[in-house]
Structures are given as C-alpha cells and as structure tokens.
C-alpha cells in the first residue's frame, strides 16, 4: 500500500475552487473558481505563491482552466458562456457561441485545435487560425443533455466528451469531407459521467460518474487480435473493467498519470483515491487495485485532481472547501 503525503495547503480564492491545471513543465499551475478569478501559482524556494491573478476575463464562475501544450496560452471556461484565451497574463481572445455555461475546455496535442462543451448540450471545435484568432470548425450536437467534460486524445486528433446523458462520445474528422463526426458512443454508466481521461498512449480511457463507479474502456481497432467486431471499419470502445463499491458518493474527477499509469479520483465523499493496475492484469479484462485512500483529503467535495506531468507522484487537488492541496505519493 502507498500513501499520500500532504506537502502544501494553499488558500487565496474566495469560495469553492472548481479547477486546477499543471503547466506542461510541471513547475507552476493555474486554479479557478467561484470568485471569477484565475490564479497562477509557482514555487519560490519551498513555498507555492500566487504570481498572477487574472480577474478581468469573466463575469461568472470559472469552471475549468487548461494550458496549451506549448505552455504559452491558458484557456478558461466560464459559466458566463464564454471561453477566454490568455497569453502573458492578458486576455487575448474571447470565444463566444455557446448558449449556456461552458463546462470544460481542452487543447489538442498539436495545440492547433481547442474543444469546448456546455450546458447547451453542444461540443464546439475551434481551429487556431493565427495570432489570437480562433475559428469555429464544428458544432457537435451528439449528446442529449449537458456536456460536462471534453478531453483530446494524447497523440491523435480524436476528441472525447462526457455528459449528463450518462454517455461518452468520441469524435474524429472525416477523411472524406473534413467534417467532424461522432464515431462512437460509450454506454455503461447509469448516471452522469463527470470526467474522463486517456492513458499515456490513448488506447484506454477512464471515466468517473455520479453512479460512484470508475470504468476502464479499451479501443478495438479494425482487425484487432481479440476479434471484436468493428462495424464500418471504425474503432469500437468497450468497457473492460468497472471499479465499484470503493466510492460512497459521486466521483467528480479522474486523472490517469501518463508517467506511472496510476489513476487518481476526486470524490463527493471528500476523499482522494489512488488505483494501480494489478500485476496479473489482462489486456482485455484488466484489473485495478486500490493503492491508497485519503479519506478526509478535503473538508468538502473534491472537485478536481491532476497528476503533475513531470514530477512523478505529485498530485494536486481542489475543493468546495476553498483550498488547493499538493500531495506526494509514497509507494
């Protein structure tokens, strides 16, 4: 069994904190919340301090922040129905089009595409068209309810979205006409899918839900060794593992570490849990074990968790309790 060691507890935001995002270099992070502000934090000696407060971009709660792969830009998704793009501490673009709250934003691996999703049930894909210019490339209406999260595949231009309609959708650009299409629907959860994350090579996806389960999905490509049928020669995603009975309330976020393969979950029962793939895990029927559980990680709902992309075993979390915590996993 491992354990999570609390390294830092940080305060600064007023009200609940919705999102945290490590910078690609792993030496700083951004946070956002109810106070309509984004804070950029970095390490000075052994202390994390707020270096910048970005407070003039949004009129309502900021739900999520995400750095571009190059680390030069930050995107923020807000309940004011806009997405802001920040560079060098200034808002350089505002993306408008959603009718309601924007819940999530994600950059593609190349940094050339941005995805957003909203309570208006739509997913938008934006092309970076030049300096501070973004053009809408697609509006995707595949979900029947509020869309909670969008995440790009780590190596391909494939987008995943999670929704209040209990499903996950996959999207890709058609080779024929350059239109974006929904290529797969992943159905197994019995309630809202709050968050999703790909593993390092993008062949698997983890999802977390209001149904208090984590699910692992695997991609089966045309001609796969397992003999899984792939209609129309399109990739099929199958649920290959369900982790149930370990969370007592809704699971709001999940992070699949690209360095270690460990999965962290953020739960409405105030806990953070870490899962490790079993040594005897099978490709088409994987098994995961609970490595450690930090039962009272926060005093209220844990809204987000994210593994540091560079510093192995470092985890960040934020909560309704108004704090950000930085943890180190000891295995």
Curated annotation (Swiss-Prot):
Keywords of the record: Repeat, WD repeat
Gene Ontology terms: biological process: iron-sulfur cluster assembly; protein maturation
Any one GO CC term of the record: cytosolic [4Fe-4S] assembly targeting complex
Organism domain of life: Eukaryota
Pfam families: WD40 (PF00400)
WD repeats: 12-51, 57-96, 97-136, 142-181, 188-227, 246-285, 297-331
Keyword Repeat: yes
PANTHER family for this protein: CYTOSOLIC IRON-SULFUR PROTEIN ASSEMBLY PROTEIN CIAO1-RELATED, WD40 PROTEIN CIAO1
Function field: Essential component of the cytosolic iron-sulfur (Fe/S) protein assembly machinery. Required for the maturation of extramitochondrial Fe/S proteins.
Similarity section: Belongs to the WD repeat CIA1 family.
Protein name per its UniProtKB record: Probable cytosolic iron-sulfur protein assembly protein Ciao1
Provenance organism: Drosophila mojavensis
Source species taxonomy: Eukaryota, Metazoa, Ecdysozoa, Arthropoda, Hexapoda
